[in-house]
Amino acid sequence: MRRAWAVAAVAGAVALMSCGGSSTTSKAAWTAKHGAALAALNADLDTARATLSTLQRPDILGSCTQLRDSLLEARKGLPVPDPPADAALRTGFDAVDVGIEDCIQGARGPNIPQLEKSFRTLREADTLMEVATRTIDNWK
């Protein structure tokens, strides 16, 4: 699965480099409206990843539920007017979503293998969100 995420990230990066876009909404306007939600998502992603390491089910369930709420709020920023940034952000969001579901189900279980899978998936999601952040930073 890790290899699949890496391949998807590389393929996405290549596709992003070949795309251009014009937008009616400026980067500054989009960031002013949605930047706080994106920052909250990234912070909650870090918290969820750290909490998974503790193996404390109530804490894991709480942090992954908070991450789910942050993801729902951050998705309100889609579509991003810049096609490369939009594609990168959607890829990151999808990865976070997969990790959240495994996290919540594993914490409710308890299902240690599912929590381990969530940890790996959220680590990959963190990398994809970093790519998305850099892509947004490069938006002209």
Question: How should each PLM-predicted stretch be described?
Answer:
Residues 1-9:
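Bacterial N-terminal signal peptides that target proteins for export
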Residues 20-23:
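Bacterial signal peptide processing site
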Residues 11-13:
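Core hydrophobic alpha-helical membrane-spanning segments
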Residues 15-18:
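C-terminal motif of bacterial Sec signal peptides marking the signal peptidase cleavage site
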Residues 25-140:
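Alpha-helical segments in soluble extracytoplasmic regions
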